[in-house]
C-alpha cells in the first residue's frame, strides 16, 4: 500500500508551533533538490521554478541537485540544464543510483568541480531518440532533422563539460555507454566520487 510523501515538522520564523510539511518542501528550504524520476515537462518545470525562486531568495547560497533518473524527454532535460547555467548560485549535482540519458546530461551540467557520484552510482550516455515510430514521410524527415540538431547540441555540451574531443563523444553516443562512478570521473562527467562513511558500517 503506498504511504505517500512523508511529512516532517517545520517551524516557520516567528512562529511558536511547528507545522507539518512534506519532506521535499522541507528539503527545498535547505536548497536541496531532487530528480528521482523520468524527466518530463512537469518535473522540469518544478525544478526550474524552485531554482528560480531560490536564486531570487539568496544568490550567495549554493544549490544541490540529487539525481536518480533513467532519462526522459530531451527538451525538458535541456531546459533544466539551461536553468542551471542561468541561476547565479553554483548548482552541485550528485548522482545516486542511476543518471542515464538526460539524467547524465543534467548531471554534467553542475558547476565544474562540484559534480559528484556516489560510490555505486551508474551513469549512461547515448544519443537522443526519435519519437516518431509511425508517421507520414514528411513528418519523419522533419523529425530526423530535429533529432540531428538536438544531438549536435547535446554533443557540444558534453565536449565543453567533459573536455573530451568531439570525435570521442560522437562515437560514444552511437550506443548506450554505461559507466561506474570512477569511470564517469575519468570521462569528465563528474569531478569527484564520494567516499563511504566507514563509521556507519557494522560488523
UniProtKB/Swiss-Prot annotation:
Catalytic-site annotation from UniProt: 101 (nucleophile), 126
InterPro entries given in the database record: ClpP, ClpP/crotonase-like_dom_sf, ClpP/TepA, ClpP_His_AS, ClpP_Ser_AS
Molecular-function GO term, any one: ATP-dependent peptidase activity
Quaternary structure annotation from Swiss-Prot or TrEMBL: Component of the chloroplastic Clp protease core complex.
Keyword line: Chloroplast, Hydrolase, Plastid, Protease, Serine protease
Phylogenetic placement of the source organism: Eukaryota, Viridiplantae, Streptophyta, Embryophyta, Marchantiophyta
Gene3D superfamilies (UniProt xref): 2-enoyl-CoA Hydratase, Chain A, domain 1
EC number: 3.4.21.92
One of the GO BP terms on file: proteolysis
Identification of the protein by name: ATP-dependent Clp protease proteolytic subunit
Function: Cleaves peptides in various proteins in a process that requires ATP hydrolysis. Has a chymotrypsin-like activity. Plays a major role in the degradation of misfolded proteins.
Protein origin, superkingdom: Eukaryota
Catalyzed reactions per annotation: Hydrolysis of proteins to small peptides in the presence of ATP and magnesium. alpha-casein is the usual test substrate. In the absence of ATP, only oligopeptides shorter than five residues are hydrolyzed (such as succinyl-Leu-Tyr-|-NHMec, and Leu-Tyr-Leu-|-Tyr-Trp, in which cleavage of the -Tyr-|-Leu- and -Tyr-|-Trp bonds also occurs)
Keyword flag Repeat: no
SUPFAM superfamilies hit by this protein: ClpP/crotonase
Protein family (similarity comment): Belongs to the peptidase S14 family.
CDD domains per record: S14_ClpP_2
Any one GO CC term of the record: chloroplast stroma
Source species of the chain: Marchantia polymorpha
Places the protein is found: Plastid, Chloroplast stroma
Pfam families: CLP_protease
